[in-house]
């Protein structure tokens, strides 16, 4: 079983902002996030959209977020 829960995109975005990611630009639902010493990440989810555990684990690899950050 995955250590990652299923959460709403808005909650994940708030958690990413909490660990230092900043909004660089936005075009529709595509948000480009940046953080010092990390490559930019495109966050392409609507706020109310549910993000499953497998996708959340993939996002974590690119952003450095942990289950405790949520």
Give the positions of each predicted feature.
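Basic nucleic-acid-binding interfaces
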Residues: 1-70
């Amino acid at each position: 079983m995955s250590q990652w829960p299923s959460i709403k995109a808005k909650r994940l975005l708030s958690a990413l902002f909490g660990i230092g990611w900043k909004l660089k630009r936005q075009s529709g639902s595509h948000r480009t996030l940046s953080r010092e010493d990390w490559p930019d990440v495109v966050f392409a989810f609507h706020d109310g959209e549910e993000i499953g555990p497998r996708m959340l684990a993939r996002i974590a690899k690119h952003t450095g977020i942990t289950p405790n950050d949520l």
